[in-house]
UniProtKB/Swiss-Prot annotation:
PROSITE patterns, A to Z: ADENYLOSUCCIN_SYN_1 (PS01266), ADENYLOSUCCIN_SYN_2 (PS00513)
Name of this chain's protein: Adenylosuccinate synthetase
Binding site for Mg(2+): 13, 40
Active site feature: 13, 41
InterPro entries documented for this protein: Adenylosuccin_syn_GTP-bd, Adenylosuccin_syn_Lys_AS, Adenylosuccinate_synth_dom1, Adenylosuccinate_synth_dom2, Adenylosuccinate_synth_dom3, Adenylosuccinate_synthetase, P-loop_NTPase
UniProt xrefs under NCBIfam families: PRK01117.1, purA
Amino acid sequence: MANVTVIGAQWGDEGKGKIVDWLAERAHVVVRFQGGHNAGHTLVVGNQTYKLSLLPSGIVRGTLSVIGNGVVFDPWHFRDEVAKLQGQGVTITPDNLQIAETAPLILPFHRDLDGLREDASGSGKIGTTRRGIGPAYEDKVGRRAIRVCDLAHLDDLELQLDRICAHHDALRAGFNEPPIDREALKAQLAEIADFILPFAKPVWLTLNEARKAGRRILFEGAQGVLLDIDHGTYPFVTSSNTIAGTASGGSGLGPSAAGFVLGIVKAYTTRVGSGPFPSELEDEMGQRLGERGHEFGTVTGRKRRCGWFDAVLVRQSAAVSGITGVALTKLDVLDGFDEIKICTGYELDGKTYDYLPPHPQDQARVTPIYETIEGWSQSTAGARSWAELPAQAIKYIRRVEELIQCPVALVSTSPEREDTILVRDPFAD
């Protein structure tokens, strides 16, 4: 059977949660493969609204959910999120949720370092969520990380603590912070271990067995391609690779397992925090998009910056991530605009670009080249078929397809999961 990998094709917050929930009903397994609890998903199921930041979206429907080895895992946040969802009536047990034994832990001093660095950066802030994601990935790459499997071997942790504390104590001294309290840390780990360990499994084995059995696997990406550590607007990016190729390394399945790569894009563009944003609207039009789209971050609550759809960036995202088709979300937010613009290129120092230059100073200085399309007055909210869309909305969708060189597979017209127009089924064999 076909697998599907869902990724954001902009700067995150594209509406992946709803699309993953819509697909998860037919998936046998849902997998998170990168990131941490720094990116949120909002799911609306009936009269219930669920806000997730670490758990795979499939857990809400009881689908087997997996947190892969590519995720940096905060055990205390995990416990809180599980408790919150259980309070909303969601069943979460080791029977329907597994955590990779090799996932690195986010520890309290990672959060400390994240905040200390951001505060010391002044105008150079990159907009971190201060949740310790970056420092935890640094320790993983530096071979200092304490991992989920270490919670079962707390008596054998001294050498690892020597390595990780030597590194962090030196950094903390530079901020006039005291050394890590090793005994307190061991006590914290001992306290949380009993809650975490029942969920710890060799998830690569679970996933390979599922694949051999012909079960549908849905890979759920976090953030978006434009926040990818290699392919995003560096340094205003996250600390992991967010492209679809990461689904393999972050879960323990081979690269052919990704299947249909579904890129999620808003019908306009948003960004949270600092960094270049060529099509940003810092005027009444941008404010109108933000108000109509309720653009506030799920995790941080920060107001999102808004702008017109940037076809250049989405085309770039589709290329580097091998996107098979896109899901266009929040089409209804554009209802009632007399004119709608699409960014089709950039100008910089007299030169025209059909891609975003790599240097941050150039990215900040490019001027967008726009194509203007007539808007529509008829509401698209709640539409579930092409027949319910106004002709100009269909024209807009078709023009987006042409410019990003990628077909639209789904169109979302409201937060409700059923308000979705299916053009091509990603799970079709």
